A protein has these predicted regions:
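Residues at the C-terminal ends
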Residues: 3-6, 28, 124, 167, ...
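Internal, charge-rich low-complexity segments
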Residues: 289-293, 301-302, 306-328
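Local beta-strand N-terminus motif with an aromatic residue
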Residues: 32, 192-193, 349-350
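Flavin-dependent oxidoreductase catalytic cores
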Residues: 1-109, 113, 117-129, 137, ...
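Rossmann-like dinucleotide/flavin-binding elements
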Residues: 27, 103-134, 177-188, 199-212, ...
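Rossmann-like dinucleotide-binding cores of NAD(P)H-dependent redox enzymes
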Residues: 128-175, 248-297, 384
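Feature captures the FAD/FMN-dependent oxidoreductase FAD-binding
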Residues: 160-204, 298-308, 313, 353-355
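A structural motif corresponding to the C-terminal end of an alpha-helix
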Residues: 1-10, 31, 164-176, 287-290, ...
Length: 403
């Protein structure tokens, strides 16, 4: 194969080739001589052995978030992995789990990434584990977040988790109960030694003026029920975080909607890895999605959103894809002060989507403590602190290996 210089040299392909079928096709079709893997090996160091043996379903896939392998550098850390807590800590956490000193009956409330990760490890260590999920499907927020086509990496990770749960049920007698709402009465009746709460967040739903008359829906609800956007041509999304921006891309590209995203801060998707943030902003602009930063919602109406928008020339360009965003504790000497030129306006909307994030829901956790529903009670994942897959999986892993 010739390189783009026309010289006969080996060509190595790298980047988003972390699935054996894609990597093999690239070599077979003559697109490259070799495939180089980096992030996929952080997610699963045994990638090559599993692929060679044909155990593709057992490969833990990289989800492409770059939060552990890249963003941790910005925060002063070292390479990690959102889906593999051992990465970077191999000496601290052996590859083989240590059997539990005392076998316990454990209930896990919530089948998201934190709940599943804990349940798998605890069961493999010898505990009797029962995993409860209130919906018909495991995955929690990643089940919803993986709906857009661009989130195929997350869908593959969810499929991997489901496969691991299936194997754990067969080999380690993990019990799984879907469509089950856990109550204090149920926990009292079962008398578990330990209860692990991992049931996620409460959506933030501000008391905007006029919300009773507005055609309003939560972003997560819309992802699960896209039919609710039928007949809506102009859609306004309130919240310019990653959920709001990914939902905007989904609506514009998969349903052909006219979408506007409102963000009160100067930048969209604060805290997201610069590369991922930049790519999504680029495609939002390409898709015709309107991004309004420094824009504060004042009231909602049946046919639109009333806002106060800072239209000063000093407001950052929301489509600036490669502007590095430093952590809040690091001052940027190159950043210019933003002046205020506030203009009140109404943005037309047939449908208003709230994507303002969530907050930890600790209600049941504290109730369980007050009623002494188990000898040991723990709170992990988003129900402890709203975060990313990285924090959810890492926290669950750390608890599961020592309980």
């Amino acid at each position: 194969i010739k390189s783009n210089t026309g010289v006969d040299v080996p060509v190595v392909a790298v980047g988003k080739l972390g699935y054996p079928d894609i990597a093999e096709k690239a070599i077979r079709d003559g697109d490259c001589d070799m495939v180089m893997l980096a992030r996929p090996l952080l997610a699963d160091p045994d990638w090559c052995n599993k692929a060679f043996a044909g155990n593709v379903e057992e490969i833990r896939p990289c989800i492409g978030c770059q939060e552990g392998c890249v963003n941790e550098f910005i925060l002063g850390g070292h390479p990690q992995c959102a889906v593999n807590p051992r990465t970077g800590f191999e000496e601290r956490f052996p590859e083989t789990f240590t059997p539990a000193e005392k076998k316990k009956n454990i209930a896990v409330v919530g089948g998201g990434p934190a709940g599943i990760t804990f349940a798998l490890i605890a069961a493999k260590r010898g505990h009797n584990v029962t995993l409860y999920e209130k919906s018909e499907k495991l995955g929690g927020k990643i089940a919803v977040g993986s709906i857009p086509k661009i989130k195929f990496d997350l869908r593959n990770y969810l499929a991997y988790l489901e496969k691991q749960v299936e194997l754990c049920q067969e080999q380690y007698q993990l019990q799984v109960h879907k469509n089950t709402t856990v109550t204090a009465e149920l926990l009292k009746e079962k008398a578990y030694d330990s209860v692990i709460f991992a049931y996620g967040t409460k959506e933030i739903f501000p008391p905007f003026e006029g919300r009773e008359e507005a055609n309003l829906i939560l972003g997560t609800d819309l992802l699960e029920h896209p039919e609710k956007a039928e007949g809506a041509n102009n859609i306004v999304i309130v919240g310019g975080g990653v959920v709001g921006c990914e939902t905007a891309h989904w609506l514009a590209n998969e349903y052909g909607k006219n979408v506007t995203v409102l963000e009160m801060l100067p930048h969209f998707m604060m805290g997201v890895c610069t590369a991922n943030r930049g790519h999504l902003l680029h495609y939002l602009e390409k898709s015709g999605v309107r991004l309004y930063n420094c824009t504060k919602v004042k009231a909602l109406a049946k046919d639109g959103v009333y806002v106060e928008q800072n239209q000063s020339q000093t407001v950052p360009d929301p489509y600036n894809t490669w502007q590095p965003l430093l952590p809040p504790n690091i001052p940027n000497p190159m950043e210019k002060a933003i002046k205020e030129e506030i203009v009140e306006k109404k943005i037309p909307a047939d449908l208003i989507v709230l994507a303002m994030g969530g907050k930890a829901d600790e209600t049941f956790f504290f109730e369980a403590g007050e009623e002494h529903l188990a000898k040991e009670i723990y709170n992990i994942g988003d129900s402890s602190r709203a975060g990313r897959v990285l924090e959810a999986v890492r926290g669950a892993y750390h608890l599961a290996v020592r309980i």
